[in-house]
Amino acid sequence: MLLSLSNYGKSIKVPREQYSSPYSVEYSFTIDDLVGDIVDSPRGAVSIQAAIPYDEWYSSKTLSRYGSWGPRSRHYSKPSAMDSWSVEKCRERVIAVGLLFKGYPYQHHHIPDWEHPESWPWKPVSSGKRGKGLDCSNFTSFVYNLAFGLKFTSDVSKQSAIGDATGPGPGTNKWIVKRIPLPEKYEDQIKVLRTGDLVFSFKKGSKSIGHAFIWVGRIGKSPDDTPLFLDSGGGATPDCNGIYVPDGVYLRPYRKKYWPYTHVSHAIRFFYSKENRKNLSTE
């Protein structure tokens, strides 16, 4: 174990495989209701994550076109039962789909299960290892795509400015999203944010957007009642037990003195009213 200092006192780093998160989620729906159509169907297959066939993932053409990022994501179809889902079910599905990738490392990739061949270029990350994984905005983009067939840019700066997403499913349909200004006060932000919102923070010392994460909201459970978010981030956040959350996809605490809050910009909401989409209740 490696001891180090954080903003919250002494915290401990442990290997990823030894980390046990104190955070959890309690859904209003069963896991099967939320993600059964993914885990029990071809939709959840690793081999179809990319826009190109699986046997081309590691081809010289892919190397030439995408370099260290690997192939881009496919555009998933609209889930067959989506029109019957409530706002709350859609919001909770965002979290449930995101947590299917819990423990995936932080990597600058377009899809979660693509791994660098040793001979390919690699953009170094905090984990210091090659392997599968996603960075923050490729994670948020992939989650909404897999969950609903809603596709939007994975560039974090451009993602923070979207007014719509393409979908559900491939084609020309557009899904209008809502930009949510966030109050300055921490407690007021908690009241405004909703489960599944995309939230964006500025880079430290800059007015450029540097991070994207997903708000967990009321379904998040923390021993100290700290609100939670879900992201693919670096390993610089200690949990409530003083253990650093590893880099990659994990639940993390939204603390007053932590960068995502101190540098927060705004949120984007995908599910919010009947005007937003048919058959969804208002809130």
Model-derived regions: residue spans:
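Hydrophobic h-region of N-terminal signal peptides that target proteins for export
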Residues: 1-7
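...with weaker cross-activation on analogous glycine-rich loops/strands in unrelated enzymes
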Residues: 150-243
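Low-complexity, Gly/Ser/Thr/Pro-rich intrinsically disordered linker/tail segments
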Residues: 228, 232, 244-283
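Residue-level marker of positions within ordered structural domains that often coincide
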Residues: 103, 144-145, 204, 218, ...
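Boundary at the C-terminal end of the N-terminal hydrophobic targeting segment
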Residues: 9-11
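Short, solvent-exposed coil/turn linker segments
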Residues: 30, 50-53, 62, 155, ...
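N-terminal capping segments
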Residues: 13-155, 279-283
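Mature, folded catalytic cores of secreted/periplasmic enzymes
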Residues: 84, 88-103, 107-122, 175-187, ...
